[in-house]
Amino acid sequence: MIRSIYAAVDSLLGYAKNCGLMDALDETFCRNALLSELKLESYEKQSNSVDFPDCLNLLCDYAAEQGQIHDTIAERDLFDTRLMGCVTPRPSEVVRKFWSLYQESPKKATDYFYKLSQDCNYIRRDRIAKDEQWTTKTKYGELEISINLSKPEKDPRDIAAAKLKKASGYPKCLLCVENVGYAGTISHPARQNLRVMPVTVNGQPWGFQYSPYVYYNEHAIVMNTQHTPMV
């Protein structure tokens, strides 16, 4: 059993290296961060590998079996986001790379940022793949219809736990920039793998990110860095 968990850790690190989330020089650091989150005091490198996101699911299974988390959708999401945070580049690294690529081409920069948002599992590709989408002709022209199935139904246990959880008021909402790196609660999603790009709008600091639910292709969000009512 424990060897399969070591293999899952190795596989997650391999995935992070292959898609450019993690530099090989950071592998030991990131491995130790993962072992800490899993409360593992030992480790042996394994030769077998597990595909992503299966390796992440195995690590959540292990945490549930060890009593570290409850085996519910919300708690698994909180935990696997913590794990992905261990292999996601720091915000400053992402910002530097984005603007470096932007000097070459704005498209290169946004393509990089969108891919990173998927690779770090902020946009969960496996769930987005479940969405239904088609077009139909109407008298007004071609209409695109989509059914969002990627946002999972809430587990009754999570609903009950959320009712007992007192709201902290921080972050003030799901779109506040203070969500970057936030550990989350049973009623507020974890965001250790969220990265927000600083942009300037009318001389004011705003943030640019991609939506995790992809209601349409490359669904982007630009929000004020100050919590203000949407009008």
What annotation goes with each model-predicted range?
Residues 1-230:
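Active-site microenvironments that recognize anionic phosphate/pyrophosphate groups
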